[in-house]
């Protein structure tokens, strides 16, 4: 496993991507631009959408990021992804698709639950995501205590997690955070969704001290600002988050806030910089699903190769520009125009 440079951990899901009318969203009390965990009342939704045209795409935020990151790296099998799957056909689909992108998969397998699924409901290029975690919910820290995973953790020089993983195995997240801090390895983290900050704030605040680079979109950043009593001004939130409690003081914390088509804000070493994303014609956008995940993938690819932050943001913007012109988190068959 000496080639593995980047370790991503998260909730492996198979996305069921479909276009729906607003009536479906209203029926299940869902909002566009939102992501939630499925409750009992949402479970009939998965069967209902299968009666229409559904595309099956590998998903899960960190898995999306790992695939895009590996796509933008010349050397394959340098990104490793882990999470928990079942023993069903969906697990095979996920493994095959993810490894076809050059990613090394080291799934924990749980035969007691089906592989997780996410209904991606698209309406006018906006989406609502409803996740039934299934086996992903059963990830255990014991996986990181196997000899194989210990070797991978030791080999990895960069770590990437997203907030969704905190609903499943917060002790695993802290375990990786501690390893990164103790060994002065960069630990990157995406806030992922406002509900995670609202309902799992104790877990988020426990992990943040280990985070060297934190990613969020404007709504996630504003939610964190409210929870921290920092207000809703993104500039203020970025500055305060950068200065917040940190375990590895050898590294300053960098804060990256994306804002869709508006400028990405980066707070680093006391300075706020704005970077404009690549403009995309509305008619060229197929699906905004995974725009944030792909930004993190591009950023991580550049960052893992020692690029300056400006170049990392450029790579993130490029990756998003490519992915939003695909359906779901589909990695293009062509080579990227920016590669490291």
Curated annotation (Swiss-Prot):
Purpose of the protein: ATP dependent phosphorylation of adenosine and other related nucleoside analogs to monophosphate derivatives.
UniProt KW Transcription regulation keyword: no
Lineage: Eukaryota, Amoebozoa, Evosea, Eumycetozoa, Dictyostelia
Pathway involvement of the protein, from the record: Purine metabolism; AMP biosynthesis via salvage pathway; AMP from adenosine: step 1/1
Keywords carried by this UniProt record: ATP-binding, Kinase, Magnesium, Metal-binding, Nucleotide-binding, Purine salvage, Transferase
Enzyme Commission number(s) from the entry: 2.7.1.20
Name of the protein in its database record: Adenosine kinase
Family of the protein in this entry: Belongs to the carbohydrate kinase PfkB family.
